[in-house]
Amino acid sequence: MKKKVLALVLAGSMLAMTACGSSSDSDAEEETEEETEETEEESTEETEEETSEETSEEEESEEETAASDESFTIGICQLVQHDALDAATEGFIDTVTEYYGDNVTIDEQNAQNDTATCSTIVTGFVSNNYDLILANATPALQAAVAATSDIPILGTSVTDYATALDLDDFDGTTGMNVSGTSDLAPLDQQEDMILELCPDVEKVAVVYCSSEANSVYQADVIEGYLDEDGVAWAEFTFADSNDMQSVINSAVAECDVIYIPTDNTAASNMTIVSNITEPLGIPVFCGEENMTSVGGLATLSISYYDIGVAAGEMAIDILSNGTDVSTIPIGYAEEVTKEYNAEYAEAIGMEMPDDYVPIETDDEE
């Protein structure tokens, strides 16, 4: 009997041990399976991440290759050669060539201050199906607009686009194949400058070329500000450089201060002005720096190079990003500076305030 009981006890113990062994083996197998699954999941995630990174790198590489394959031809029509327009063209060319390198071809032409030549130049650009046209100065812009409604046109050194393009409802964009940058410095501040430096002024001569739309616009605005301040003024206009001397002589005979807006004809012939006004001690206020450096006293200046750079950035946006030129707002200079011609100021005995900066000449540079 004792032997049977002992046998049963031993059998029960062995069964219990077997059950424990089976349970341990099962747990171990489950842990191994879980570890395997986790390893497989981690491996799959890493593979997916690597694949995604490789795909992204490939896409970036393809984009860079596409960008490097871009090739464009840009036509530049500049109305006339003088320092302000030259600086705007230089800023534009520097910007697009830095971006595109050898993948941009620039056809730069100067119209020698002839509107008919502007038309001939831009017609050639259109016939050659250039990718973009830069029109430097208002007559160049008007000629380009007359020549094409398809090729993107950017203007620079254009004072007022609404006037230049005869736009009735101008909201900052032209709504046509045109955008660009303006060389307009605040006209109210220019009039303030006249009164600041010449508080006893009796009469201001407003002198400009009657065939330049932007000059007409600026003259009208300045005359309005002078009226508001009760300052007398008279208008003196010339058709071209041939009658500038007689017009300036008439102006100094009647007025004690001269104002000349940004005017391409005047800008190319400022020595005619200074040869008459400087010996008489008459202050001449100009619409921009380069005119002042040759034959004026003071100006509220912008950087023409900078507005050329801004136009270049617009060109890149149009050509490489496909931006619609008609939706790009006209750009304006972000900063203006009170500047003066130190030699002219000394010649007429004018002491300048401390917040006016002398214009650097080639000798000073």
Predicted segment positions?
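Sec-dependent N-terminal signal peptides of Gram-positive bacterial secreted proteins and lipoproteins
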Residues: 2-23
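Bacterial lipoprotein signal-peptidase II cleavage site
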Residues: 19-32, 37-48, 57
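Hydrophobic alpha-helical segments within soluble ligand-binding/sensing domains
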Residues: 67-69, 161-203, 302-323
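Extracytoplasmic "Venus flytrap"
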Residues: 67-94, 99-101, 107-117, 211, ...
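An alpha-beta-alpha
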Residues: 74, 92, 179-226, 324, ...
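Beta-alpha junction/loop-to-helix N-cap segments that form part of ligand/metal-binding clefts
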Residues: 108-168, 260-278, 282-287
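Pocket-lining segment of extracytoplasmic ligand-binding domains
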Residues: 213-282, 288
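Hinge/cleft segment of the Venus flytrap/periplasmic-binding protein
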Residues: 317-365
